[in-house]
Amino acid sequence: MTLKNRYKESIRPKLLKELGLKNIHQVPKVVKVNVNRGLGEAASNSKALEASLNEMATITGQKALVTRAKKAIAGFKIREGMPIGCTVTLRGDRMYSFLERFINLALPRIRDFRGVNPKSFDGRGNYTVGVKEQLIFPEISFDKIDSIRGMDITIVTSARSDQEGKALLQELGMPFSKN
């Protein structure tokens, strides 16, 4: 059973009772997943950006969008319009597929993994987790990467509070640490 079907058939009715909601449309759901990577070296090294775009496409199954500097910052040696990172926004079936692979395959492959921080919610039910290396994803092989780079993964939910968001992610299988 896919994560999307599991959400519709078992998680949504369970959350409806747990959260004491009256309507099934009030139950929090995952709206989108943003995968973002900032590349400071992209200003001087165009191959780093190219490699990063390919890795993001391999991990997410969707072409990455190049993010550009909004204004020049002399201290960082960047000018307005220079490429400084890449991002992918996943919705629908690709989002559920990525979430399933991230929770069940990638997270357990993190070294010394004891669960994700339960305090990384933003106050509106959205959750962000930082990944230090792209090697946790089974699609990326160690031989094909030029350097280890991290990324930020933001799970945007329709939850109105952190408690609702946490309840949703726990039901989806997100392994929160006990601290």
From Swiss-Prot:
It holds the Pfam family Ribosomal_L5. GO terms for cellular component: ribonucleoprotein complex; ribosome. The keyword Membrane does not apply. One of its GO terms (biological process) is translation. InterPro entries: Ribosomal_uL5, Ribosomal_uL5_bac-type, Ribosomal_uL5_C, Ribosomal_uL5_CS, Ribosomal_uL5_dom_sf, Ribosomal_uL5_N. Part of the 50S ribosomal subunit; part of the 5S rRNA/L5/L18/L25 subcomplex. Contacts the 5S rRNA and the P site tRNA. Forms a bridge to the 30S subunit in the 70S ribosome. This is one of the proteins that bind and probably mediate the attachment of the 5S RNA into the large ribosomal subunit, where it forms part of the central protuberance. In the 70S ribosome it contacts protein S13 of the 30S subunit (bridge B1b), connecting the 2 subunits; this bridge is implicated in subunit movement. Contacts the P site tRNA; the 5S rRNA and some of its associated proteins might help stabilize positioning of ribosome-bound tRNAs. This is Large ribosomal subunit protein uL5. It comes from Prochlorococcus marinus (strain MIT 9215).
